């Protein structure tokens, strides 16, 4: 049957996470920042000592020029949705920054090593093997990587893809084969032997011959018992039980019990062709919606400002507890659920499965004894459309893309990447006391901000004192969110017009209607084709023996292409992960091959032969080609020339003897009347339905609704002002946590120079999941997937059952008069008419 609409495009797997940016080659080892002591609670900010001379932090070695970006991961064939940016290891919780000990005097800001040129981010292919992360100076102990944030719960199932537009019902399958002709009633059992005729009366005893001289004739043979009533000739075999009238086609056995729908249960909705092999799981089965990025760990409590260093010099701020930036919870490793891979190409419309085997024809109603074919029972009602096949199975989600390879320890933030879609703005915590303006520690890398679905709003960390604003980390590009669920199915394509009916076959005698095949889904009624002009009536063909009607089954319902399984639940939005680099939106994979259209379900019972369609408008008088002027009817035998005007008495008006009307030239044989346009032969019972026309290509599946726009990713919390990035002085020993001081005034945001990016630290433990943030604004609309290939046209269905003969069209206009026949031979002279009043002398008649 024509293919059901293509299954909705698999939801394009979320774009693969950007491959880890080729890890930046290890930045040269920054001089090791002393390991940060565990960040004690931020002591109350000591009085901001003057910035002690920055102890010389070992000048961060110039970050080695960024090592070559790790080899660009091989570019996945399809641009995998960007592989996860290697999840920048979630910033390990910044080890609690040791209380800002007395900041060692920050060394003078060593010139920040120039940041090695940012390695060209490896093409975020699959994560290139990360270049080895340069050893990072020992960071304060990176908090252990939190367990991956809980994978965001899978979002609610995406809407089931819109059910593809209803494929046009395949053409009505050919009329089911007429049920087997009722079995010809077995010849009735031989009628009971006629009762033996009464034994013939014994022949009359021969009269005893007159007693001739002979002895009386022998007694006439006891009339041999009359022939044994011919043994009642075995009743003619019950006249062969004249096949009972085809049990008036036992009304088509109740449509063969509708063949019980032949249990051909709608052919298993041809298993919706395996959802076209769900195209390859989109490359990199993009990691499922990245498990919602574990909620961003609570913003590590910004280490309390170190206790004032002893010498009141504000100790270098303990490494600005890396702004505690709760490690972006380790982006929970992408929860399983590899996103549905790029929707596989909609499987190419699988070749429509072979028409589901017609379910076994319903049991033939017991064939009534075959009578003369009863009038065809009305065609069984079109069976209901079989239930839609079960939705095609949603192909297994592609495997989650690989998580970026080793999560490097967060390095200092690199240059701020492009701004990912803003995550939901975290609630701004109350400003912590402003710590002394320490030199900024090297900013950690922003974790890869993978745009999750806007995650739940993490609990706002308590913002530490606003440190000087560090340079922005690289803006993570958000991954293009998964394409929204397919919009509602486009409107069903226009119904193709029903083609003109084929020429009527010779009117076969209508075979007894077979049991109605299962009705196919009612084919969309084609528009009745314009009634062709009735052709000249063909001679009524002899009724052919009723051909068996072609099998009716309208093509069973096209197995619905499984309604797209419900999309996997869309994980609830995780907290906005840090916006990762926008994965390149993976190309929407080519639509997965449409699942093969399920095998057409068994033909539905043949629709009842629709009543005669309304009489098509009378076609223009079937001008068959003008019948060639009917062959001149044989020239009428030349009419005897009408009586040539009886030239006898000039007819009145001296029709010279009345000139027979000038012999009406033998009537020219009437121009062979253009036979009335032959009545249209009764439309033979429609010839067996040709194989269903190849279903026009299914109206293109309504355009895939453009994926609803994705909510824009929640706004990124506004980055707190960046503190100036001082060079990280060596961390002093963790001071004892002082009592939290009153929040100092927020220092002006200084802009520090961007420190070199350190290698990514190990991922910190995932912070607890913050409460869900408000849903972020919808993300940008995902790219519309490429239009899937047009499905194959369904196989041409068997010819529809012949339509009932159209009513006889009106006779065509008479053909033009045939040429005037030759003048008939002169008629015999008419009798002289009575002399009319001599009229004016007419023209002399022909000699």
UniProtKB/Swiss-Prot annotation:
Keywords: Calcium, Collagen, Extracellular matrix, Hydroxylation, Phosphoprotein, Repeat, Secreted. It is found in: Secreted; Secreted, Extracellular space; Secreted, Extracellular space, Extracellular matrix. One of its GO terms (cellular component) is extracellular space. The modification Phosphoserine is found at residues 85, 501. Residues 1-847 are annotated as: Disordered. Forms the fibrils of tendon, ligaments and bones. In bones, the fibrils are mineralized with calcium hydroxyapatite. It comes from the Eukaryota. Pfam families: Collagen. Residues 20-39, 93-109, 127-145, 193-208, 219-228, 298-314, 334-343, 500-543, 551-599, 628-638, 697-712, 763-777, 793-838 have a biased composition (Low complexity). Prolines at the third position of the tripeptide repeating unit (G-X-Y) are hydroxylated in some or all of the chains. Residues 51-65, 778-789 have a biased composition (Basic and acidic residues). GO terms for molecular function: extracellular matrix structural constituent conferring tensile strength. One of its GO terms (biological process) is extracellular matrix organization. The keyword Repeat applies. Residues 147-159, 685-695, 731-746 have a biased composition (Pro residues). Type I collagen is a member of group I collagen (fibrillar forming collagen). Trimers of one alpha 2(I) and two alpha 1(I) chains. Belongs to the fibrillar collagen family. This is Collagen alpha-1(I) chain. It comes from Cyclopes didactylus. The gene is COL1A1.
